[in-house]
Amino acid sequence: MKRTIALSLLAAGLTLGGSAMADAVVGQAAPAFKGVDAAGKPVSLDQYKGKYVVLEWVNPECPFVKKHYDSGNMPTTQKYAVDKGVVWLAVSTSADGDHAGKSAAINDWVKAKKAMPAATIMDTGGAIGKAYGARTTPHMYLIDPSGKLVYAGAIDSKPSANPGDIKGATNYMVQAIDESMAGKPLSQAVTKPYGCSVKYG
């Protein structure tokens, strides 16, 4: 009897977890969202309608994020995208609000790393992350001007925290932007993200 109850509770937990976390599907409309950035300004996906949009899940304390920022790889990728007219939005998902002054800290970090996001969205409570199924930092998404999700996954092909691996890696985001803008099918539209787990509480 106890085993039956335990299995029932486990099944219920899995069902609840599945309903809470929904993966955005490549080839379908990207989930709409509204949020507030680290400067306290409102941000929504709708305001960038008609443009390419990158979503990058970020955590400055994550070794995998540090790999791409300390090396300059992520800021360089951001500049490449922005120079092509792409809107780059960073997303910081957390379950514990802004009690530790995360907004101010992440603003300082963005400036120190010479990063180029149009905004860093403070996803307190994790609603945006859950809508997209964001699992790691970094976890990358590319949305085309029609609002369709065209890429979801890793920043590159080397799933490690070693900066030395960047040189020999395929930058999936650059590849996705180039191929999508050229009207080509993406070589890799979905890849496995790697990094630190996004914390939903």
Language model region names:
Residues M1-S8:
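Bacterial N-terminal signal peptides that target proteins for export
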Residues D46-K66, I177:
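Short active-site neighborhood of thiol/selenol oxidoreductases, capturing the structured segment around
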Residues L142-G201:
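Thiol-/selenol-based redox modules, centered on thioredoxin-like
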Residues S19-A30:
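Cleaved targeting-peptide boundary
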Residues A12, G17-S19:
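N-terminal signal peptide c-region/cleavage motif recognized by signal peptidases
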Residues F33-V53:
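A short beta-strand-turn-helix
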Residues K66-K113, T124-A131:
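Structural microenvironment flanking redox-active thiols in thiol-disulfide oxidoreductases
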Residues N107-V150:
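Short, internal strand/loop/helix patches
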